[in-house]
Amino acid sequence: KLFPGDMAQPRGLKAMRAILPAGTQVYAVGGAQPDNFADWIAASADGFGLGSAIYKPGDTPQSVKQKARAIVAAFDAAW
């Protein structure tokens, strides 16, 4: 888990890979979002942890559904 991802940025993950043991999985949490999935994947992120990108207090079930669908579509397009 790379948290907060928005502080490290994809370039930080690339630098960390030089010292991490081969095969170490890294998941960007906090800062990964649909518009930057491709950047994280290019930096070798193995996945993402998302919270407020999907749900914030007061969101309706419909808005959560729409956000989740948009996130899945962005992930599929980036991967």
Per-region residue spans from a language model:
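Expand to "…catalyze enediolate/carbanion chemistry for C-C bond making/breaking, isomerization
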Residues: 73-79
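Structural motif
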Residues: 43-44
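Structural preference for beta-strand elements that scaffold enzyme active sites
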Residues: 23-27, 47
